[in-house]
Amino acid sequence: MEKIIFATGNEHKMIEIRAILSDLGAEILSQKEAGIKADVVEDGATFEENAMIKATEIAKIANQMPEYKNAVVLADDSGLEIDYLNKEPGIYSARYMGEDTSYRIKNANLIERLNGVPDEKRTARFVC
């Protein structure tokens, strides 16, 4: 059975990935489930660069492990871009206001920053 390692520690993301890839008939593992303990520095300038950095680093480690030598390694990076805020938080979405800050507090801060901004200028997107 083909093995696919997804370069993430995010359990919610793994639920989504397994649902999307369920028809492949492959064993789908998070990097944690594969026993890969790496804290990859996402220092790219774009979502795509960060995904490539993660996939490359995790693949290097997996390639050293006999059970994952031929595994496929996938990664993504995603985040919220708010046009009025010059596409903030963007690639920093996960780290916006600190990684330990709850989404509720982060969202409240973003809404506060948009206070007084007309609805038609409150455009945003989730980039993945």
Put a short name on every predicted segment.
Residues 2-5, 11-128:
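Anionic-ligand binding patches
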